[in-house]
C-alpha cells in the first residue's frame, strides 16, 4: 500500500480554528494522509467526523490506519470530490455541521507516484487525474485543446507570462506528433520560454504543470462549489478552516469569505447601528491569514506558502 509522505502544515492552528466541540459533527474535506482527521478525532467524544477524498489510494490507506475510529463509528470515509459535500452528507441524513476543514496542499502519494504524470521531475505518461475514473486527462488537454484555450489556462491558472509562446510551441509540436510524456511536455515548455527567463524563478515547467493540473481536475471550480455548500451547511457557532498553498486558491477563499462577512450593499454608510436583518451572518476569525511559525518553516519548506483563513457563522440567515 502506498505511503503518505505529506507533512501536515498548520495542523494545530487549523484544528484549533474549528473550536471542536466533543459532541459535534465535523468534516475533513481533504482526507489525504489523515493528519487533520486524526487531530479532530482526538477531540471528539460522542461526535462524528466525515472525511472526504476522491482518490481511492487515500481511502484505502486510511481504512487501515484509522480502522479503530471507523469501528467505533466516530469516523466515516467518503470517496468523492468535495464539490459533492452536501449531497454526500445528505445521504447520511446530515443537514448541518459544526465545522469543516480544507487542506488544499498536495497530500497524496499520487504526486510521488511518477506513473500518475503530475511531476515535471519524473518522466511518465501525461495524466494528472486525481480521480482515475474521470475521462479528461492532461494528454487530452495538451494535445486537443485549441491554442486560445491553452493560453487562457496557462495565464489564468499558472500565472505564466509566457503563456502565448508556450501554447504556440505546444500547438506546433503536436502537429508533428502527439505529446505523450511529461518530459516531452517539459521540453516544449522550455522552448516557449526565453533562455534568460529560464535561468530564474525555479523550474521553467512549474507554472504550466500547475495550470494543466488545475484544468484537468477543475480544482478552482470544485473549491468554489464546495465552499458555497460548506457555508450553507454550518450551524450557528460553526467554523470553516481553509489552508491554501497558492495565490489563486487563497484569492478565491479570501473573496468568498469577504462577501459573506461584509454588510449588504443596501446598508447606508455611516449608520451608528446596523438595522436588524442587515448584519452579516458570518465573521472572520482572523482578519489576516495565519502563516506558519519560524519553527515550522525551518522544519518544512512547504510551509512558506501556506495561509490559513477561518470564518464563523454567527447567526441564521443567508
Swiss-Prot record:
Predominant subcellular localization, coarse grouping: cytoplasm
Residues engaged in binding S-adenosyl-L-methionine: 34-36, 53, 82, 103, 110
Coiled coil: none
Keywords for the protein's UniProt record, in alphabetical order: Cytoplasm, Methyltransferase, rRNA processing, S-adenosyl-L-methionine, Transferase
Pfam families: Methyltransf_5 (PF01795)
Major enzyme class: transferase
GO terms under cellular component: cytoplasm
Annotated EC: 2.1.1.199
Family: Belongs to the methyltransferase superfamily. RsmH family.
HAMAP family in alphabetical order: 16SrRNA_methyltr_H (MF_01007)
Protein name, per record: Ribosomal RNA small subunit methyltransferase H
Taxonomic path: Bacteria, Bacillati, Bacillota, Bacilli, Lactobacillales
